[in-house]
Amino acid sequence: MISQLFHKHQGRYGYRRIVLALKHMGCHLNHKTVCKLMRQLHLKSTLRPRRYKSYRGEIGRIAPNHLSRSFDASRPNEKWVTDVTEFNVCGQKMFLSPILDLYNREIVSYELHERAHLGEVLRMVKGAAQRLEAHERPLLHSDQGWQYQMGQYQQTLKDYGITQSMSRKGNCLDNAVMENFFGLLKIEFFYRKKFESVDAFSQGLHGYIHYYNHDRIKEKLKGLSPVMYRTQSLLEPT
């Protein structure tokens, strides 16, 4: 059963998630036992990369660090984080720009493109804003990348009632949750496969983000996936 779960999730689950998945199936084993069995079965999950840097100095307005490493949220669409990461696929660079909700670590919007340009980032913001109820006014935190300093980006946030927040210069820990997602994405998806084309990479990436949102359980979310956790929270009486 442990081996089946490990291979079903393509080696992405370590012993902690295997314990949670077994629990959902009615099989209660402790962490030590699962860890020992995985070692005996030679089942080992995979490990972490280098980041794309979009900082080009102060070319626009720098926003305050409103998030201030407060990475927990009490409801959906309260606090979002974003960044851009780079992939080299078949000799071509591809750039992913996602928004992650700190409430349940769900990717609420993303854009994938051959170049890191402002249009991609604006489309991502608009995609996320379409999810908002009239009363919702999220905080959106980023690093000091050039895209986030541009007047057009900052005006778009204002138009949707989104408060801008920025990390301090050169301090990646101020956006640690987004950095962790990129590390996870590259370990569980990008480094595990050889892509024969950019199209194959794009399709695989879309599939992984769907898997991450809907199927990949998290200990922090009571053993649920991000979407399951959000759905359950909306059903709970207020």
What are these regions (language model features)?
Residues 23, 39, 43, 155, ...:
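Residue-level detection of the helix-turn-helix DNA-binding "recognition helix"
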Residues 56-58, 142-144, 150-151, 157, ...:
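RNase H-like two-metal-ion nuclease catalytic core shared by retroviral integrases
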Residues 69, 73-108, 114-116:
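An active-site-proximal beta-strand-loop segment
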Residues 111-134:
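Active-site beta-loop-alpha junctions of metal-dependent nucleic acid enzymes
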